[in-house]
């Protein structure tokens, strides 16, 4: 019996959630990382009070107000919303103000798309108002359908269908003998950030780019179209930015790297590097169908074909297209609303929470569905302050402006306050839209254990289990489509924490994580709110209250999840970072890089063998001719040993720190220990910065994080260990070798910092 109880004790320490529940989501008895027993119990009680406050009725009314009119950058209602948010922050007791930045925000003055041959056709480029949708008729205030930061252009040329417009699609076109030089390409939305499509098209010699919403992706293939169902109607169009942010930087194109304040030195428009090289225009599938139907040439590969009732040909031509776009290149104000609750013990350590308030049109789902949760969190925290709660650290709530054009408000704020943030910012927590379904968690892996712990304390409104358990079971259900479902299901059932997603870009955490190196989380619910109204006039209160989180219970769950996270981070005696999962994840990235290289080596060896054997000639269909692929050199061996050694060192330090924290927990509240916690927490705040490099990534110095970055040719999608991974993908093998050395050095520095933190803890406990 003694050994049995020893085993039980061990598992309660390692996997506490398996043995102690959350007392029906009241005050849990599970120990909190970074808290002494007494402080942990007090924190649990305050958190329970907090989670009882958010009210779905308030969320609904906030959304009705904030999405009542179009509120894009430069609009009257955008400023009105900022002032409304400011007034509410102040009413709730927060110290709040607006910070204004002046940014380049183009709006269209000319949009023309017409087919000149073989038949005449002029695209509507309009989204019609719907009688049942009260705000869809606000035409005078709506932004037209366009892609921001497209260059002005007036071009004529043959049309070529390029699937999703990614580099691998152009490789297939090469095999078909199709060139896009001098052509206008038409690409489908999705499978990458939209700005990648004109970037790759221009690199291949195209003179213009159209992007359309394919019904197979977000239209009638999935469900009824709006207003009968949630999907994109035939005339629905996805607006959006095509700024080349991943290659250059997000934020104002005229003030890269510095805040867009009135006295900032601005580039001339012609010198702005993130504007597209060719004109771009988004269109509906209603406008795309006649253009695609007029194409001839080879049939598109089967996987390229969509669900429009036409044969999908590649071209070029005989469709000849005229595209003309011109813009008002104006400087417009953005209004960031910043609110603060001062810390009582460590006011110089900041926990920052943000969501944007601007939309492309009415923007109920994106972004107001999560902005309302942020507001209800702020109201609830203000209520706790009035009841006597005093956060240990300073809490900063941010309602960003200008996110949609490309993270303007948050980037300019971070660039303006970069030195302060490097000194004071502990964690940034982001949301950007919320729906109904399963909690998704992304972020810095030093926070993986922390956010898993929070998720175990929140009730899912539909199933009444924890949002953590629902996320776990959903991942188990989805594992059947994985390459190794058995191994994945085993990990999901046995690993103490669910793996959180690495972060690329696409929302307001980007400058915090990728530029300054602030540990970050990005959270939201979704999966049961499929829809096709993204960035259209139909993303409004009517759509959201009919097809998404109609009772706003998931808006409340988001407020409970994020607000609990904010409180737990703000109140912890020791910031609840854990580095064991970071080390484990980094080692996983190393193994994936080695496999990526090995797979690429074998792929090229096999292709060269097939060329030698004459396989391509033997299998050529003369009625469907293709071009043989070019012979390539097999990639060289890369030495991953420095990275492996660095990860092993990081693992040892992480375990040492974890052990030291466990041994010191009971004495964290002692005066002698408390006096030394400031130095320890400063080391922990520094830990994410150690994973950055002041010189940045190759050819994009604004991006400084060596573990996470948006992909140059994927955009929002993350590239982990980006310098090495993209070096391999882009066949820059010498550069990849150099990046292995840089990453290894950063990991060694991280290991040394964590080892120092462990010794600080051990010294404090003596």
Residue ranges and their predicted role:
Residues 32-45, 64-179, 184, 215, ...:
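Noncatalytic luminal/extracellular "stalk/propeptide" segments of secretory-pathway proteins
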Residues 233-299, 346, 402-545, 571-572, ...:
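Metal-dependent peptidase/peptidase-like ectodomains
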Residues 666-766:
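C-terminal amphipathic alpha-helical interaction region
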């Amino acid at each position: 019996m003694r050994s049995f109880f020893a085993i039980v004790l061990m598992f309660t320490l390692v996997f506490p959630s398996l043995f102690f529940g959350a007392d029906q989501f009241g005050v849990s008895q599970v120990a909190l990382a970074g808290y002494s027993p007494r402080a942990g119990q007090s924190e649990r009680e305050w958190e329970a009070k907090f989670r009882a406050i958010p009210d779905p009725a308030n969320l609904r009314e906030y959304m009705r107000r904030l999405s009542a009119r179009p509120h894009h950058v430069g609009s009257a209602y955008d400023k009105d919303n900022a002032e409304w948010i400011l007034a509410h922050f102040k009413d709730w007791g927060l110290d709040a103000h607006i910070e204004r930045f002046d940014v380049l925000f183009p709006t269209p003055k000319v949009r023309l798309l017409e087919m000149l041959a073989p038949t005449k056709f002029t695209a509507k480029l309009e989204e019609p108002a719907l009688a049942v949708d009260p705000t869809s008729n606000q035409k005078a205030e709506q932004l037209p359908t366009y892609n921001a930061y497209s260059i002005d252009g007036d071009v004529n040329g043959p049309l070529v269908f390029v699937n999703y417009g990614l580099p691998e699609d152009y490789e297939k076109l090469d095999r078909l003998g199709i060139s896009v030089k001098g052509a206008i390409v038409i690409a489908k939305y999705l499978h990458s950030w939209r700005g990648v499509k004109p970037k790759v098209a221009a690199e291949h010699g195209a003179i213009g780019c159209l992007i359309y919403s394919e019904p197979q992706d977000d239209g009638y293939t999935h469900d009824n179209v709006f207003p009968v169902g949630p999907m994109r109607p035939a005339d629905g169009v996805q607006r959006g930015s095509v700024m080349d942010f991943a290659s250059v930087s997000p934020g104002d194109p005229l003030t890269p790297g510095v805040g867009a304040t009135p006295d900032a030195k601005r580039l001339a428009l012609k010198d702005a590097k993130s504007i597209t090289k060719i004109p771009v225009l988004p269109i509906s599938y209603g406008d795309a169908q006649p253009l695609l139907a007029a194409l001839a040439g080879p049939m598109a590969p089967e996987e390229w074909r969509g669900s429009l009732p036409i044969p999908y040909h590649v071209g070029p031509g005989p469709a000849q297209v005229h595209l003309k776009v011109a813009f008002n290149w104006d400087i417009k104000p953005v209004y960031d609303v910043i609110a603060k609750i001062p810390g009582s013990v460590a006011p110089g350590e900041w926990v920052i929470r943000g969501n944007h308030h601007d939309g492309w049109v009415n923007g109920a789902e994106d972004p107001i569905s999560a902005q309302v949760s942020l507001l209800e969190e702020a109201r609830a925290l203000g209520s706790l302050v009035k009841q006597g709660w005093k956060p240990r650290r300073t809490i900063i709530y941010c309602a960003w402006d200008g996110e949609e054009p490309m993270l303007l408000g948050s980037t300019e704020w971070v660039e303006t306050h970069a030195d302060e943030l490097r000194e004071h910012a502990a964690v940034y927590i982001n949301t950007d839209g919320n729906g109904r379904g399963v909690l998704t968690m992304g972020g810095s892996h030093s926070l993986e254990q922390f956010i898993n712990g929070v998720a175990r304390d929140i009730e899912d409104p539909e199933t009444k289990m924890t949002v953590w358990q629902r996320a776990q079971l959903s991942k188990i259900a989805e594992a059947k489509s994985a390459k190794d479902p058995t191994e994945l299901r085993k990990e999901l059932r046995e690993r103490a924490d669910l793996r959180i997603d690495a972060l690329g870009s696409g929302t307001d955490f980007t400058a915090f994580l990728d530029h300054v190196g602030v540990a970050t989380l990005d959270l939201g619910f979704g999966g049961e709110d499929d829809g096709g109204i993204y960035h259209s006039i139909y993303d409004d209160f009517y759509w959201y209250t009919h097809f998404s989180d109609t009772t706003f219970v998931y808006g409340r769950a988001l407020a409970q999840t994020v607000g609990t996270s904010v409180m737990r981070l703000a109140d912890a005696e020791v910031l609840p970072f854990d580095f064991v999962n970071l080390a484990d994840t980094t080692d996983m990235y190393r193994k994936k890089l080695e496999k990526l290289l090995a797979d690429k080596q074998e792929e090229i060896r096999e292709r060269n063998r097939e060329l030698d054997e004459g396989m391509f000639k033997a299998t050529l269909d003369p009625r469907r001719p293709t071009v043989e692929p070019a012979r390539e050199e097999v990639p060289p061996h890369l030495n991953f040993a420095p990275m492996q050694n660095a990860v092993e060192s990081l693992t040892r330090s992480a375990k040492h720190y974890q052990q030291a924290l466990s041994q010191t927990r009971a004495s964290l509240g002692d005066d002698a220990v408390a006096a030394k916690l400031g130095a320890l927490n400063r080391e922990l705040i520094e830990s994410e910065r150690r994973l950055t490099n002041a010189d940045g990534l190759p050819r994009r110095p604004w991006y400084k994080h060596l573990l996470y970055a948006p992909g140059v040719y994927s955009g929002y999608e993350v590239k982990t260990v980006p310098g090495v991974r993209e070096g391999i993908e882009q066949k820059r093998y010498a550069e990849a070798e150099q990046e292995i050395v840089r990453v290894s050095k950063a990991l060694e520095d991280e290991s040394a910092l964590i080892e120092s933190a462990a010794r600080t803890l051990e010294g404090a406990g003596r």
